[in-house]
């Protein structure tokens, strides 16, 4: 079993972009972007696809599957 975690924070750093910049691009609150970047919450699949498009990346580069050890 695993849980999906996003790599939005790393992707923004790679592109030299900020949470505020992404919030403006998406029309979202910067607090929402912050929650996504810390994986406190996750964007919808539709939003994740839009983020990938905005950052000119593949959506696969924004998602990782991390195993949970019991």
Regions found by a protein language model. Name each.
Residues 1-18:
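A short, Lys/Arg-rich alpha-helix, primarily the initiator
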Residues 12, 23, 52:
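The alpha-helix within a helix-turn-helix
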Residues 13, 27, 38-40, 67:
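Residue-level detection of the helix-turn-helix DNA-binding "recognition helix"
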Residues 16-35:
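Short alpha-helical DNA-recognition segment
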Residues 17, 43-46:
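Residue-level signal for the short linker/turn that defines the boundary of a DNA-recognition helix
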Residues 37, 55, 63-66:
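DNA major-groove recognition helix of helix-turn-helix
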Residues 46-61:
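DNA major-groove recognition helix of helix-turn-helix/homeodomain DNA-binding modules
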């Amino acid at each position: 079993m695993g849980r999906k975690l996003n790599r939005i924070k790393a992707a923004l750093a790679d592109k030299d972009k900020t949470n505020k910049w992404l919030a403006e691009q998406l029309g979202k609150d910067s607090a929402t972007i912050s929650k996504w970047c810390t994986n406190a919450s996750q964007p919808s699949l539709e939003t994740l696809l839009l983020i990938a498009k905005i950052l000119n990346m593949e959506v696969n580069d924004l998602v990782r599957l991390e195993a949970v050890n019991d």
